[in-house]
From Swiss-Prot:
GO terms for cellular component: plasma membrane. The lineage of its organism: Bacteria, Pseudomonadati, Thermodesulfobacteriota, Desulfuromonadia, Geobacterales. It is an enzyme of class 7 (translocase). NDH-1 is composed of about 13 different subunits. Subunits NuoBCD, E, F, and G constitute the peripheral sector of the complex. This is NADH-quinone oxidoreductase subunit B/C/D. GO terms for molecular function: 4 iron, 4 sulfur cluster binding; iron ion binding; NAD binding; NADH dehydrogenase (ubiquinone) activity; NADH:ubiquinone reductase (non-electrogenic) activity; quinone binding. In the N-terminal section; belongs to the complex I 20 kDa subunit family. Its main location: membrane. It comes from Geobacter sulfurreducens (strain ATCC 51573 / DSM 12127 / PCA).
């Protein structure tokens, strides 16, 4: 019988359709692929509490050619989109796609220049799973919806038998932004309604009344002067002058041409040397309200002193559309990536920089995103399409090295690889299996968080901080609100401080548990990851009881926390404190005495204490080099000076030392949480300075002043005094700092985010040269980095 003679409603073909669909629906082969926060919740569904194996989809496939299901779990970045399309096209037919999370579905809260507004603009999608991020249960529901779609809608028998007609796999169209899908961030049907609100447009209106309101100046904090006044005058005369307007740290203004000499003096000749370059923070001053007081650009070099704990800021003022300043890389090697970022984001030229090229944006990107005249939103730009994804390809690996010998092998590890812990591209130059040199291509997870900070009011930005280090939860909130509170002079009540500390330390434990499980898997131990995710769920039960959220509670507020602790919190915390010490011993029994685990780590990826200081390494990775430095002790914040705990250190500077430090940090965090549980103060959980927070309802109902503040804060948001503040916290991965700049409005003028992952990955070649590729996976796993923390 010919193809045309086969009846459409053939009972044999229909039965065969049912049989094939039954097999395919119950044996989906998902690819090991993740983009951001949503992927962590997707992976949680593979653990014992949720058990995705019930649906026949528990084995993640390492390559697209072995997979038939692609889960787009997280934000789709324009730099990553070409790789997503390539992976999809390499999958064998039939194949299906689940879009998991608001960002994958539509761009979500990231309507920003670097993000594709929905993965269905480059590949077709079968099922959309809502949420930011979706819970594991939501992913399982999405999986069941896909199974139902396969069973009900597909007719594969004709395709299998090479007959005409039938259908299998994804058949839905790829959409075009603004043509076959809405470009309005609020969804379809809203095109005729004007966009309103500070969350969707820059809130500059002609002569708003709030601009005329008097505000007290930013309070001046106490900070060391390091004895620099006479020292700098002797060395540089009156060309380097103190900035008396600075309220957060000692600040000097320096002519651009003197910058390397000033930095070299501070690092090597000062009586109290500044050993570490903390950050390079640039500001485009072109939209200041008092424009005449400011240059076109300001470059801020933040330095750290270990002898007299404190920070120092060196400001250099630049003018013109193509400003230039000497590079600081000859003084601080860590300046390399920071200056490349400033060039990428602002177009500032650093004379003498050894490799000044883009670092976050694609190599063919037009413009500099953090300039005030660059578009904010993806929906203000040309729609991103499949053609764009095919046209904008990554640099070839050979472009990363000056010279490649005939016998040299170049290996691309990433941007999609199960061992890289996210979307990042390591380019390895090999002699056999030994790493001779390497370079790193980052920016595949760049979500434009700093640009977004310039269009949200001060409280609106808090949810975005959750998604920087998406494994650290409220630790991100704490870093941000701490800087804003210092700028405003806000005092947080004791109960609010204790609640913050308790939750921050619970998230430190949760972070280290995820790190421990995935790191053990990197070196061949599969059991710990299932144990650690189970214990992480116990922490999330507490977090959900207190905040209502899991990964991203967004629960800290400027001035305190969102609400008081609920009834029963103490019992839940006590149960966890009783459980976890024994569990930690079990982990050590599994790993510490394991000879394979030990040999894979001992002596591998060594970095010395001096090298760590030189390259800006912080947190557990610094303490694993024998340097006892923890901001909670050295520059206390949020009441940590009132808690008793030890700072664990190790001397090896290798993967083993990094493992040992984090295990001991879990113990110390448990000790801090126990103190919070035992000694939780009574009273308010948020400040009563209603200029900056919403008043309690009873105060707003009985006091006109409180009611006025309620109205102002609810309608336009609070407005800090003019000024700037940089402060950092001891986050789980290292030091996380926010440099916030206020022009006296209800939105930040500039939000600079200093993360630990950025300098740690920059220093990776130092730890990796001379080791094998297999050791390299252990080294990057031992560092503990997150791509959103790296790329922001």
């Amino acid at each position: 019988m010919s193809e045309t003679e086969v009846p459409q409603n053939n009972i044999i073909l229909a039965s065969l359709d049912d049989l094939i669909n039954w097999g395919r629906a119950n044996s989906l082969w998902p690819m090991f692929f993740g983009l951001s926060c949503c992927f962590v919740e997707m992976m949680t569904s593979f653990t014992s509490r949720y058990d995705v194996s019930r649906f026949g989809a528990e084995v993640l496939r390492g390559t697209p050619r072995e997979a038939d299901l692609m889960v787009i779990a997280g934000t789709v970045f324009k730099k990553m989109a070409p790789s997503i399309l390539r992976l999809y096209e390499q999958m064998a037919e039939p194949k299906w796609v689940i879009s998991m999370g608001s960002c994958a579905n539509s761009g979500g809260m990231y309507d920003v220049y670097s993000v594709v507004q929905g993965v269905n603009q480059i590949i077709p999608v079968d099922v959309h799973v809502p949420g930011c991020p979706p819970r594991p249960e939501a992913f399982l529901q999405g999986l069941m919806l896909l199974q139902e779609k396969i069973r009900r809608e597909e007719r594969p028998a004709r395709k299998v038998l090479h007959l005409a007609g039938g259908s299998e796999g994804t058949t839905r169209p790829v959409l075009v932004d603004g043509v076959t899908k809405s470009r309005d961030t609020r969804g379809p049907g809203m095109e005729g309604i004007a966009i309103r609100g500070t969350s969707v447009q820059h809130p500059h209106f002609p002569m708003p009344r709030s601009d005329e309101m008097w505000r007290p100046p930013a309070p001046k904090h106490q900070f060391p002067d390091f004895g620099l006044a006479g020292e700098l005058e002797t060395a540089f005369g009156h060309r380097v002058v103190r900035d008396d307007h600075a309220t957060d740290m000692l600040t000097y203004r320096c002519p651009p041409e003197l910058l390397p000499d000033v930095l070299r003096h501070l690092k090597t000749r000062s009586a109290a040397p500044f050993r570490r370059l903390e950050d390079v923070a640039c500001v485009d001053e072109s939209c200041r309200r008092e424009r005449s007081r400011f240059p076109d650009f300001t470059v801020n070099y933040h330095l750290l002193n270990f002898h007299i704990p404190g920070h120092l800021r060196i400001k250099a003022e630049l003018r013109g559309d193509t400003p230039e300043i000497p590079s600081a890389t000859s003084v601080f090697p860590a300046a390399d990536w920071y200056e490349r970022e400033a060039f990428d984001m602002y177009g500032i030229q650093f004379a003498g920089h050894p490799n000044l090229r883009r670092i976050l944006m694609p190599p063919d990107w037009e413009g500099h995103p953090l300039r005030k005249n660059h578009p904010f939103r993806a929906t203000e730009m040309h729609p991103y399409t499949t053609d764009d994804a095919r046209r904008h390809q990554a640099l070839p690996a050979s472009d990363f090295f000056d010279r490649i010998d005939e016998e040299t092998l170049i290996l691309n590890l990433g941007p999609q690889h199960p061992g890289t812990h996210g979307i990042i591209r390591f380019v390895l130059k090999l002699d056999g299996e030994e790493i001779v040199d390497m370079d790193t291509d980052i920016g595949y997870h760049h979500r434009g968080a700093e640009k977004i900070g310039e269009r949200q009011h001060w409280n609106q930005f808090i949810p975005y901080t959750d998604r920087i280090d998406y494994l650290a939860g409220v630790q991100n909130n704490l870093a941000y609100v701490n800087s804003v509170e210092r700028l405003c002079g806000i005092t947080v009540p004791d109960r609010g401080i204790a609640i913050r500390v308790m939750l921050a330390e619970l998230f430190r434990i949760a972070n280290h548990l995820v790190w421990l499980g995935t790191f053990a898997a990197d070196v061949g131990a599969m059991t710990p990851v299932f144990y650690t995710f189970t214990d992480r769920e116990k922490i999330f039960d507490i977090v959900e009881m207190v905040t209502g959220g899991r990964m991203h509670p967004s629960w800290f507020r400027i001035g305190g926390v969102a609400d008081d602790l609920p009834e029963g919190w103490d019992g839940a915390v006590k149960a966890f404190l009783d459980w976890m010490p024994g569990r930690l011993k079990e982990y050590e029994d599994l790993l510490k005495g394991n000879p394979i685990f030990r040999e894979r780590l001992k002596g591998v990826g060594v970095i010395t204490g001096d090298e760590a200081l030189e390259w800006g390494i912080t947190g557990p990775n610094l303490r694993a080099c024998g340097v006892e430095w923890d901001l909670r002790k050295k520059i206390p914040y949020n009441g940590y000076q009132h808690f008793h705990f030890e700072v664990p250190t190790e001397e090896g500077g290798d993967c083993w030392a990094r493992y040992r430090v984090r295990i001991e940090e879990i113990r110390q965090s448990l000790h801090i949480v126990r103190q919070c549980w035992k000694e939780m103060p009574a009273g308010r959980w948020i400040t009563d300075d209603y200029r900056y927070v919403l008043p309690k309802k009873r105060d707003a109902l009985h006091d006109i002043e409180s009611l006025i503040h309620h109205f102002i804060n609810a309608t336009r948001g609070m407005a800090p005094p003019k000024g700037e503040n940089y402060s950092a916290i001891e986050a789980p991965k290292g030091e996380n700092g926010y440099f916030v700049v206020s022009d006296g409005l209800n939105v930040p003028y500039r939000v600079r985010i200093k993360t630990p992952s950025f300098p740690h990955i920059q220093a990776l070649p130092l730890m990796s040269r001379g080791w094998l590729v297999a050791d390299f996976l252990a080294i990057i796993g031992s560092i503990d980095f997150v791509l959103a923390d790296l790329d922001r």
